[in-house]
């Protein structure tokens, strides 16, 4: 049972409400309408053996998030965001035979409903989930059984919701260094790793479409190769065949990594404290052009499912410069950028508005792009 949250009771809603509506948009129209999105990060995807698995709340708050409330979700909409990505570790509290715990499923369902009621598009995925993805190369049969079991249950649980709910095949785990190392692997190894990624994504599409109902026409988000821009734009990466023709591709954008990820110097790079040189802008434009030319120009919409910055040791104005630049370059090419956010970095989950230091960030990220 979930504790500490009185707003968990029930997931039944008015069947006439917009959350059950199929709008009939193309996936590109849907992605364009999203505008800018934000992640409900470090919440339902939290995991770890040290977390008491007796209640969903222990996982929901295990990585620092407060218990999610309807007001918290409505706050995203009030701040101008058009989409909410909900990362989930479905293995938490999982029962035998890969059965999702009913309490965990019910709690995520409540939050998804709150988002749909707020007129947010919702992206629902399987996240890192304690890393069981790493076993695909050596235990493909069991991993695929778990993968299909999870999505079969999710298709059933969320199948009645309208097409503002999007399913995402997986997070950024599609790619295995145990098969192919991008720096030293062979072409044969590379082909093998890409083939496995393509197989998982095709399995996902086939399963969702076969479940029928609204899932037959639901917009689907297909994970790129480790969601890396260059590797996803490689000819070996294939979008799955989809009878509905409603798939978009997902990449993540943390480039340059020395700026976006590092707090301090590491053995692989020196921490970059400022962004904005002509070279920085050129790199961003080159990557966005590559995505546009490879996918958007050929009718495949692009969602940048995560982009963000490690804010430690950086000036807020410079962080905003980078984030707004990514947003602008993405939106100018009809792509939807989804900000990676965890508790109280950019959005305050207790006051339901942007934190003071980034109080104008939402305006930058949701401003119209000419």
Per-region residue spans from a language model:
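An active-site-proximal structural segment forming one wall of the substrate-binding cleft
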Residues: 20, 63-84, 94, 98-128, ...
């Amino acid at each position: 049972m979930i504790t500490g949250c009185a707003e968990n009771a029930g997931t039944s809603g008015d069947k006439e409400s917009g959350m059950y509506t199929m709008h009939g948009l193309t996936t590109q129209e849907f992605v364009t309408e999203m505008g800018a999105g934000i992640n409900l990060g470090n919440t339902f995807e939290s995991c770890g053996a040290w977390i008491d698995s007796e209640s969903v709340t222990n996982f929901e708050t295990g990585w620092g998030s407060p218990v999610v409330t309807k007001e918290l979700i409505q706050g995203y909409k009030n701040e101008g965001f058009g989409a909410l990505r909900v990362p989930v570790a479905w293995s938490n509290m999982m029962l035998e035979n890969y059965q999702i715990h009913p309490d965990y499923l019910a709690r995520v369902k409540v939050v998804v409903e709150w988002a749909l009621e707020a007129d947010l598009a919702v992206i629902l995925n399987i996240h890192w989930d304690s890393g069981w993805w790493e076993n695909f190369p050596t235990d493909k049969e069991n991993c695929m059984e778990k993968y299909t079991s999870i999505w079969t249950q999710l298709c059933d649980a969320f199948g009645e919701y309208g097409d503002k709910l999007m399913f995402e095949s997986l997070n950024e785990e599609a790619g295995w260094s145990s098969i192919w190392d991008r720096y030293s692997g062979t072409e044969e190894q590379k082909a093998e790793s890409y083939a496995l990624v393509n197989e998982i994504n095709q399995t996902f599409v086939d399963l969702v479409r076969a479940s029928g109902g609204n899932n037959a026409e639901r917009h689907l988000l297909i994970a790129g190769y480790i969601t890396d821009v260059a590797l996803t734009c490689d000819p070996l990466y294939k979008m799955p065949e989809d009878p509905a023709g409603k798939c978009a591709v997902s990449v993540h954008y943390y480039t340059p990594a020395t700026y976006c990820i590092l707090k301090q110097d590491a053995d692989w790079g020196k921490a970059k404290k400022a962004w904005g040189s002509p070279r920085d802008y050129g790199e961003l434009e080159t990557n966005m052009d590559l995505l546009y030319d490879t996918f958007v120009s050929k009718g495949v919409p692009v969602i940048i499912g995560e982009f963000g910055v490690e804010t430690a040791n950086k000036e807020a104005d410079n962080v905003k410069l980078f984030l707004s630049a990514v947003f602008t370059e993405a939106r100018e090419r009809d792509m939807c950028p989804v900000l990676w956010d965890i508790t109280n970095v950019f959005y305050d989950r207790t006051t339901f508005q942007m934190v003071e230091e980034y109080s104008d960030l939402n305006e930058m990220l949701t401003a119209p792009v000419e």
